[in-house]
Amino acid sequence: MEEQDFTAGIFLIDKPVGITSFGVVSRVRRILGMKKVGHAGTLDPFATGLLVVCAGRPATKMISSFMDGEKEYIATLCLGVETETQDPEGAEIARKQVGFLHAETIETCLAGFKGTQMQVPPAYSALKHQGKPLYYYARKGIEVKKDAREITVHEIERLGEGDLEGDHPSLVIRVRCSKGSYIRTLGSDIGKVLGCGAHLTDLRRTKSGFFNVEDALTDVDMLAEDAHERFMKKVLSVESVGKLLQ
């Protein structure tokens, strides 16, 4: 696509660790020289992977449709350690030696999380309560009642095999789930069922709907001198993506 012809499109970004989803959007705005840019589904700063970014009004109008799609993640759990945010960014609140876990015990636990279920959103999340995100209240120590929401875990599997042993071994899982699913909370709940507690140390989104992170622009592309040219080579047109949504 010629640069002067660009008015709207969809970009797949592989978000690097340590930057917010809004930070990625800000970068894209600067690269494209456009203000009307948004993303379809927040990734926490510690997380990496696929962020669907829409530029131009025809594209941003499609954001809700993209957010409705299924998501796929690869998550690494640290067993035996719990944090207040269920991820590596929060303070440690509990620690327990894991010791030994049979492979069969792990598989049975994961199988129990497959299907439709009710999930209570984490206190440290962007969900709104009286106009403010839940993390606003959590940081002030204000407890807010969080209603459980229905989610569906379509697939969940362990990546790796064998028994786990040691003080705080890692468990790596792949999850394909519905919109609104919190993998941090899923990881914490898995730790509870295993009897040792857990928090996420790594989270990577690999798929969002029919989009795959393998096709995404990288941090190198965003920081390159010819970033605009690289983006134009990888832009997905509103028309082509619209056909996929039909």
UniProtKB/Swiss-Prot annotation:
InterPro entries membership: PsdUridine_synth_cat_dom_sf, PsdUridine_synth_N, tRNA_psdUridine_synth_TruB, TruB_C
Keyword annotations of the record: Isomerase, tRNA processing
CDD domains: PseudoU_synth_EcTruB
GO biological process: mRNA pseudouridine synthesis; tRNA pseudouridine synthesis
One Gene Ontology molecular-function label: RNA binding
Keyword tRNA processing (UniProt): yes
Enzyme class: isomerase
Family: Belongs to the pseudouridine synthase TruB family. Type 1 subfamily.
HAMAP family per UniProt: TruB_bact
Protein task: Responsible for synthesis of pseudouridine from uracil-55 in the psi GC loop of transfer RNAs.
Name of the featured protein: tRNA pseudouridine synthase B
